UniProtKB/Swiss-Prot annotation:
The active site is at Y133, K161. Pyruvate binds at T45, I203. Homotetramer; dimer of dimers. Coiled coil: none annotated. Its EC number is 4.3.3.7. InterPro entries: Aldolase_TIM (IPR013785), DapA (IPR005263), DapA-like (IPR002220), Schiff_base-form_aldolases_AS (IPR020625). This is 4-hydroxy-tetrahydrodipicolinate synthase. It comes from Blochmanniella floridana. GO terms for cellular component: cytosol. One of its GO terms (biological process) is lysine biosynthetic process via diaminopimelate.
Length: 292
């Protein structure tokens, strides 16, 4: 089961926008050393929309190589085309990928029946465990709990990253899925509350800059020490907030550069560099949280 602090890992690039392979190794080692429980490779934070198909596959495979069995690797494999999602998922059938994270189709705005058939078709094309990913603010469609319940009956659909920030979803989902179905928060600010209600962990943007804190926070939740978990979360709230002052991953890549975790905060168009105003606010949040 995937639990605890799972980092939604950034994809490091050099000054010209090429993938920084050794920079990726440094990040993987950093997360191994700081208690992260698993890595999501090439999800939203990893700029899945900005990489070519071959780059996407390369980054996931390099992440597996550098992890070397020390951390599970979850591959981002979603697409708004069902056939493309199947193609990308099947690239990892013979790899050491632990699971795939499949985002709801963006732009198309499918019906709930369309979403059901989309994810069923992907799951039936592979033996790899599938984690659903619901993030309506980015995709324009909402995978409702009733549809998740239907999908949870498919053997290799094993969980969901629920990123609405709507805590009512936890109880709704728990009533509709089996007890082994994995519930992961995709919203750092509300993650402690999500887990307190029965969630199993968080796929975290903040873990890029505060992996030890996020890991410790999750450990406290697992021990039912919610006071200690909230103490950490309250210190990190300005960081959680600041990492979304601009579209993800613009702020978190800048923050990682400031922390010396990557050499450049290079992004690919249409993403552009962070504004001076926001960089000042992010720096203050990092300093106030004793991260910088």
């Amino acid at each position: 089961m995937f639990t605890g602090s799972i980092v939604a890992l950034i994809t490091p690039m050099d000054s010209k926008g090429s993938i920084d392979r050794m920079g990726l190794k440094k990040l993987v080692d950093y997360h191994v050393d700081n208690g992260t429980s698993a890595i999501v490779s090439v999800g939203t934070t990893g700029e899945m929309s900005g990489l070519t198909h071959s780059e996407h596959v390369d980054v996931v495979m390099w992440t597996i190589e550098f992890s070397d069995g020390r951390l599970p690797v979850i591959a981002g494999t979603g697409s708004n085309s069902t056939s493309e999602a199947i193609l990308l998922t099947n690239q990892f059938n013979d790899s050491a990928v632990s699971a795939c994270l499949s985002v709801t189709p963006y732009y198309n705005r499918p019906s709930q029946e369309g979403l059901f058939q989309h994810f069923r078709a992907i799951a039936e094309s592979t033996n790899l465990p599938q984690i659903l990913y619901n993030v309506p603010i980015r995709t324009g469609c909402d995978l409702l709990p009733i549809t998740v319940g239907r999908l949870s009956t498919i053997k290799n659909i094993v969980g969901i990253k629920e990123a609405t920030g709507n805590l009512n979803r936890v109880n709704q989902l728990k009533r509709l899925v089996n007890e082994d179905f994995i519930l992961l928060s995709g919203d750092d600010i509300s993650a402690v509350d999500f887990m307190r209600l029965g969630g199993h962990g968080v796929i975290s943007v903040t873990a890029n800059v505060a992996p030890k804190d996020m890991s410790t926070l999750c450990s406290f939740v697992q021990k039912n020490d919610f006071k200690s978990a909230y103490d950490i979360n309250n210190r990190l709230i300005p960081v959680h907030q600041s990492l979304f002052f601009d579209s993800n991953p613009i702020p978190v890549k800048w923050a990682c550069k400031e922390l010396g975790l990557i050499s450049y905060d290079t992004l690919r168009l249409p993403m552009t560099s962070i504004s001076k105003e926001h960089s000042v606010l992010i720096r203050k949040a990092l300093e106030d949280a004793d991260l910088l």
